[in-house]
Amino acid sequence: MKTRTIGSLTVSEIGLGCMNMSMGYGKADDAESERLLNSALDVGYTFLDTAQVYGSGHNEELIGKSLEGRRSEYVLATKCGLSREGINGDPAGIMKSCENSLQRLRTDVIDLYYLHRVDPNIPIEESTGALAKLVEQGKAVSYTHLTLPTTPYV
């Protein structure tokens, strides 16, 4: 499969968004999802995308369990700052979310860590400061943020 570059990361041209394995389209079968994840790596997918909010952590747990022993074969993207409780861009919340995601994913580093939503109550500099600190600590390779379509652009 052809590859693309995202910052310093080289990923398969087609990535696997994993949300549907834990939410959004009805109950998914974990055994079938595990087969899908492993088959995706077998055919050349190297970019997997998940988030703490997908299935309230279940999606990250599924990936961690299903692909244990294969971590060197894929680039892992996950997200923080959005949960069933709402948007939270608080630096302490971001740090805790990262620790929880690392445990669920059974890894010591997240390749691309997203702030899932910009918190209108927290200055973006504070949220991105926490993401930068995770990179400094070696818990993330890189970071970015997503925005809502209604977020004003300057």
Tell what function each PLM region has.
Residues M1-Y74:
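N-terminal binding-site loop/beta-alpha segment at the start of enzyme catalytic domains
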Residues S12-L16, L76-T78, Y113, Y143:
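Hydrophobic faces of well-ordered beta-strands that scaffold small-molecule active sites
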Residues M19-M21, A51-V53, K79-S83, L115-V118, ...:
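Active-site beta-loop-alpha junctions enriched in small/polar residues
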Residues A28-A40, D90-Q103:
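Short, acidic/polar
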Residues L37, E60, G64, C98-L102, ...:
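Generic structural signal for well-ordered alpha-helices
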Residues Q103-P120:
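Active-site groove signature of glycoside hydrolases
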Residues I122-E125:
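Active-site-adjacent beta->alpha loops and helix N-cap segments on the catalytic face
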Residues T144-T150:
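Conserved small/polar residues in nucleotide/adenosyl-binding loops
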